[in-house]
């Protein structure tokens, strides 16, 4: 059905197959940059992530908020089974994420989207997968040195793929050095990524090799414990970690301590510390920064939001020798709604999805 035949009063339902391939990583980075900028300009438009757990390990995460400039307000909700395997977290089962999109001016429910789950099934066009990678890209663009071209990467899974795609969208890559615990996995990953973006992607043997000489150091793992020694960091580097778990995993007895990819030394040496959402650090007791704050290594006032850097209310990097640290601590609706609105509009224009005409609409 073409867009001009659509019933604009109906709710549009989109399934996973109907939203594939509708946004590029370059567009995702631009959309999320707008989302975080608007989140800083209008802070009551987004709320911290909230999570609840069942006794059997099912976790439901909700991300409420909106982007006034795009005319959307809503939420992303997803459920998954969470399991701990040694020093790593895994997900034996994940359900499709559900996006609800309301018109931020009229309160009309415009659409319901069921997102993709696994990158191996959907390729690398999953808007859920794009979110974390593209947010890293926004941080690299804003905080890494302008001449950054050598990248060190921990991890060789789906998160790592989208990290490389994101940095390729914002910087001219000369080389990416990759370390993961399994040599065969990292070799295969590098071969695959090298052909995907036609850049030099090389496996390395130690964490030290990842950090030495890199302009940007990125961790993209499911680790529960620090993956590198912060004393190895070099002046001028930009550092990114992504594990920002919630304290309920400890309170519920699944973990003995909070998950974190960074160590205290990384936090101690960072001249600039940026997160996606400040309140989540304290509300969820996210160990990567919550623990150093409790120990007095830094104060909460040392932690700034990514949106502050984008709007200029915080200067971000002010010198080439500074170590900047982006704790990509959790998803936010600022990112989710920015991506979802673009995908939703394009799907509707392309005639995708199923219209649901509710007999009893909302009232004025």
Regions found by a protein language model. Name each.
Residues 1-129, 147, 304, 334-337, ...:
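N-terminal ligand-binding/catalytic initiation module
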Residues 169-196:
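NAD(P)-binding Rossmann-fold cofactor-contacting core
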Residues 212-213, 234-235, 269:
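Alpha-helix C-terminal capping/helix-to-coil transition sites in glycosyltransferase folds
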Residues 224-238:
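Rossmann-fold NAD(P) dinucleotide-binding segment
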Residues 338-364:
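Phosphate-binding loop/pocket of nucleotide- and phosphate-handling active sites
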């Amino acid at each position: 059905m073409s867009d001009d035949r659509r019933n604009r009063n109906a709710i549009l339902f989109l399934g996973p197959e109907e939203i594939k391939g509708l946004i590029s990583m370059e567009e995702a980075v631009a959309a999320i940059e707008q989302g975080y900028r608007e989140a800083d300009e209008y802070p009551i438009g987004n709320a911290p992530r909230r999570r609840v757990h069942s006794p059997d390990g099912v976790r439901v995460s909700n991300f409420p908020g909106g982007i006034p400039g795009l005319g959307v307000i809503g939420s992303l909700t997803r459920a998954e089974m969470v399991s701990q395997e040694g020093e790593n977290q895994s997900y034996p089962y994940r359900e499709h994420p559900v996006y609800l999109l309301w018109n931020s001016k009229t309160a009309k429910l415009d659409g319901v989207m069921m997102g993709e789950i696994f990158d191996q099934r959907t390729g690398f066009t999953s808007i859920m997968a794009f979110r974390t990678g593209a947010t890293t890209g926004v941080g690299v663009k804003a905080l890494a040195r302008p001449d950054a071209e050598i990248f060190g990467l921990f991890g060789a899974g789906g998160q790592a793929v989208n990290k490389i795609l994101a940095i390729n969208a914002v910087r001219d890559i000369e080389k990416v050095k990759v370390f993961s615990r399994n040599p065969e996995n990292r070799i295969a990953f590098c071969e695959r990524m090298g052909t995907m973006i036609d850049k030099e992607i090389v496996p390395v043997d130690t964490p030290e090799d990842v950090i030495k000489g890199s302009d940007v150091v990125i961790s993209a793992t499911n680790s529960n414990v620090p993956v590198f020694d912060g004393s190895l960091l070099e002046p001028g580097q930009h550092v990114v970690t992504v594990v920002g778990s919630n304290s309920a995993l400890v309170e519920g007895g699944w973990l003995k301590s909070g998950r974190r990819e960074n160590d205290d030394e990384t936090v101690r040496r960072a001249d600039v510390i940026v997160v996606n959402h400040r309140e989540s650090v304290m509300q969820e007791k996210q160990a990567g920064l919550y623990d150093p704050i409790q120990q007095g290594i830094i104060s909460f006032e040392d932690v700034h939001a990514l949106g502050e850097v984008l709007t200029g209310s915080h200067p971000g990097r002010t010198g080439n020798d500074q170590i900047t640290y982006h704790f990509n601590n959790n998803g936010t609706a600022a990112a989710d709604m920015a991506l979802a609105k673009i995908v939703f509009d394009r799907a509707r224009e392309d005639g995708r999805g199923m219209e649901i005409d509710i007999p009893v609409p909302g009232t004025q």
